[in-house]
Amino acid sequence: ETFFKTQLVFWLLAAIDGHAKNFSLFIEPESAYRMTPLYDVISAFPLMAKGSLPPARIKMAMSLKGRSRHYHWSRMLTRHFLSTAKAAGFSPKRATAIMQETAANTDSVIESVSALLPTEFPDKVAGPIFAGLREQAQKLLSGQKTF
């Protein structure tokens, strides 16, 4: 479930370099382990905003599953997320709930992150990321079959 949520958040962020190496484990005493926080997650929204990277050319590092693998960010569809969830062993109902919950929480997450940013943090970076997140989340909330 965490992996699915992460792929969804990578898509929301247009974090095109989100790949398996972003996932690490802490090895703890007595053969226990837990996931580390994600790291090296970079959004392409600032590059799209200044016209350096056309959305149609963006490919994600990890694909979604469908009849084939889907890497193109702008062509990822609701059904691809649902197929990926099914392949990971959980129901389309749960996947849909995760998508809706994540999208519904986007504004509050943006507010929290915005409050943590230093005042000198460049708006040319934060602005496009926040706007892009809101736009992608709205697509999920509206129930669009295609994005």
Regions found by a protein language model. Give the residues of each.
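Anionic ligand-binding catalytic core segments
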Residues: 1-20, 24-147
